[in-house]
């Protein structure tokens, strides 16, 4: 059975890169009828942010990436927080000492800094401490770390399923710390121990971890365990080809949710980061992605995460994928957040229908449609100028509108066209000032539709205010 996992660190906002890697882990597990695990790597206590774990899990659920095992759903391989598994890592670090694959190192932080200055990195000097002496010093409580003892000379072969075989000279592989002096493991030890104990068969992660993989391969060899298959995905890039980061891009999934991006659209867009459908389609469901997914269709070129392209895709989902009822339902929290209410479900649906071609995110709807829900809406400079130009015509139009009995789009269109013809002016010379009076904008859906939706009483009230 295929078992995949993601192991995010709760050190800040849920990252779009985490979602990208999670998506491919999820798809590969589902494609093969396997299991997808979420494990929280919270051993870096200095960078730990309270509440970050809950936000990561909430973001995965928002994106529709359900997992079979994890800290909040449990499972047969728990606990799923590394901070709750410390005795395990200590046990396996001791095992490596016994097997001759690790050693205790007692340098102080100051000594390590001096070694780095002189040698460019740790030089393995504690390898030469006799094991009996090291054990005695540890028993006395002398602070120390446990380091991997990389076999030298020699080479380590890493097979990456996307890139082929890479051979590393062991002289280039450092004796990394496996267990810190506070008893917490480093990423390398915890990662390998957990992947083995949780039965992970396929490790799908970002390409920045490729350089760590020879260390992990050596650890599997040291324990006598079979290594999983490794797939290192290309990193998401900014349009200028630099690695995506919060300095240049919006990387927080919470930001995308708050801005009114649809989880389906964001998920669809992330699928296209390094993957293409056999038929070249850009819009597809998660299920269609899973059915079409093969590693042969994953490209290693740096995929560009372009916010404008995502906005375009989000707009396509709003206009073409979701039903009118779904869009109306999803804009409600954004209307409430903007302090707006709606008189009926039918009114809201019609407002969304009229505005649908004009907004690309859910948050834009209350911004662009404010005049449909409140009398407190802004008036643009252009609209104000157009209103002032058209005041004489609007004063003559007002009594006609007030006595108009049939308040439908067709009847109102006939009235306005007839009025313009009677005055010998183009329809726009009447329609644009009226549009400005009713909405505060010149960029709106059709005027007749807006008149009908606002209703006679509200439309006349706004026109009276403009003429006052």
Swiss-Prot record:
Monomer. The gene is gltX. Catalyzes the attachment of glutamate to tRNA(Glu) in a two-step reaction: glutamate is first activated by ATP to form Glu-AMP and then transferred to the acceptor end of tRNA(Glu). Keywords: Aminoacyl-tRNA synthetase, ATP-binding, Cytoplasm, Ligase, Nucleotide-binding, Protein biosynthesis. A motif ('HIGH' region) lies at residues 8-18. CDD domains: GluRS_core (cd00808). This is Glutamate--tRNA ligase. A motif ('KMSKS' region) lies at residues 243-247. Its main location: cytoplasm.
């Amino acid at each position: 059975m295929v078992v995949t996992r993601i192991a995010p660190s709760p050190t800040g906002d849920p990252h779009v890169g985490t979602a990208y890697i999670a998506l491919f882990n999820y798809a590969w597990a589902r494609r093969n009828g396997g299991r997808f695990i979420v494990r929280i790597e919270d051993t870096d206590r200095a960078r730990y942010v309270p509440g970050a774990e809950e936000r990561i899990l909430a973001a995965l659920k928002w994106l529709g990436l359900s997992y079979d095992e994890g800290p909040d759903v449990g499972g047969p391989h728990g606990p799923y927080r590394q901070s709750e598994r410390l005795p395990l890592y200590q046990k396996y670090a001791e095992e490596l000492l016994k097997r001759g694959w690790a050693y205790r190192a007692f340098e102080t932080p100051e000594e390590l800094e001096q070694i780095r200055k002189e040698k460019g990195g740790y030089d393995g000097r504690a390898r030469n401490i006799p094991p009996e002496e090291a054990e005695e010093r540890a028993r006395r409580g002398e602070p120390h770390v446990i380091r991997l003892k990389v076999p030298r000379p020699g080479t380590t072969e890493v097979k990456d399923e996307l890139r082929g075989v890479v051979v590393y000279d062991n002289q280039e592989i450092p004796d990394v710390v496996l267990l810190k002096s506070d008893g917490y493991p480093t990423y390398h030890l915890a990662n390998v121990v957990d992947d083995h104990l949780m039965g992970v068969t396929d490790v799908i992660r970002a390409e920045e971890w490729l350089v760590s993989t020879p260390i992990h391969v050596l650890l599997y060899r040291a324990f006598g365990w079979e290594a999983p298959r490794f797939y290192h995905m290309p990193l998401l890039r900014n349009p200028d080809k630099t690695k995506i980061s919060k300095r240049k891009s919006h990387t927080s999934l919470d930001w995308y949710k708050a801005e009114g991006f649809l989880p389906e659209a964001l998920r669809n867009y992330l699928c296209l980061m390094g993957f293409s459908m056999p038929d070249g389609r850009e819009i597809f469901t998660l299920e269609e992605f899973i059915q079409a997914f093969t590693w042969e269709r994953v490209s290693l070129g740096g995929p560009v995460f372009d916010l404008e392209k995502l906005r375009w895709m989000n707009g396509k989902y709003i206009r073409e994928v979701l039903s009118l009822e779904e869009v109306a339902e999803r804009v409600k929290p954004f209307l409430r957040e903007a302090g707006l209410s709606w008189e009926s479900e039918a009114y809201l649906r019609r407002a969304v229908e009229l505005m649908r071609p004009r907004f690309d995110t859910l948050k834009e709807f209350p911004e662009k449609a404010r005049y449909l829900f409140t009398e407190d809406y802004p008036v643009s400079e252009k609209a104000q100028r157009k209103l002032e130009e058209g005041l004489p015509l609007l004063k003559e139009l007002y009594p006609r509108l007030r006595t108009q009995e049939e308040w439908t789009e067709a009847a109102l269109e006939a009235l306005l066209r007839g009025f313009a013809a009677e005055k010998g002016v183009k329809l726009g010379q009447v329609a644009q000032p009226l549009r400005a009076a009713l909405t505060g904008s010149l960029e709106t859906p059709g005027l007749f539709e807006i008149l009908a939706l606002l209703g006679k009483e509200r439309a006349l009230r706004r026109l009276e205010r403009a003429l006052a």
